Amino acid sequence: MTKDNNNNPRYLAVKTLERISDGAYSNLQINNVIDSTKMSEKDTRLFTNIVYGVIQHRLTFEYYVSKLVKHPGKLQNWVKELLYTAIYQMIYLDKVPNRAIFDESIKIAKFRGHDGIRRLVTGVLHKIDRDGLPQITGVNAIEKQSIEASVPVWIIKQLNNQVGKAKTESILKSINQPANQSIRINIKKIEKKALVKELERIGFTVRDSEVAADALVLKDGVAAHTALFKEGFYTIQDESAMLPVQSMDIDGDDYILDTCAAPGGKTTQIAEHLTTGLVVALDLHENKLHKIMENAERMGVSENVDMVSVIICSLVL
């Protein structure tokens, strides 16, 4: 396994999840891994699926591991992430046989840890295979909802107060449905019809978004791993995240402040509508501001973007 680690989707998923749990942006980490490795298209999809799947179901998996391991608080972070990735595959990836999940997970445990960790991982996986996942018991109704839907308790309480218990239950049932792979067309660089043609030419299945005007929904490929993306003809953004800017009546000479701007999806979206105007991106972390400018340069809108650190702003004030 050692010689293939740099292109092993499961091994890379564990490492990526470690970085994300330490505060890194998930999309940036995923894109960095894809760009810096030589994974096949199939392995890239598996890697992306596992990382986003664990993020999506993290609270649920944390509960399971807390019941399957005697002292879960003593586990190293990478061991937790390894167990989460294995559990995700066992539950949600029907086409992957358990023997393959077990074999790969145990190899990673053996490579990264000592024999005790290998035995622990082996024991946990075989226990799940033999007895199934732990039942959710000993918690109140809201805590049970939180674990099942992987949504923090405080959010469920807020939803209950704002929209009522019935609507909250409906939201929680739908919240973990697989998200669309959506992109936002760079209207300064290309027309929708031309972009659709190019995407279909390189193998994507493309449809119009039902949510946002400048969005497309893609299947059968990885949107962040194309020359079209690198050349700034589109950016990756959730459909609903495009709506705030879409609702703005932006004039080309407007000056607009985007607070808490990172990672910059809305900043570049605003800039695409500007000619002589300017959008000022404000964020607490300077390294995140640099990433915004990288995206603005890729999208060809950097002349309409300026960046200000919150720290600098507070010193001036």
Whereabouts are the PLM-identified features?
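S-adenosylmethionine
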Residues: 1-317
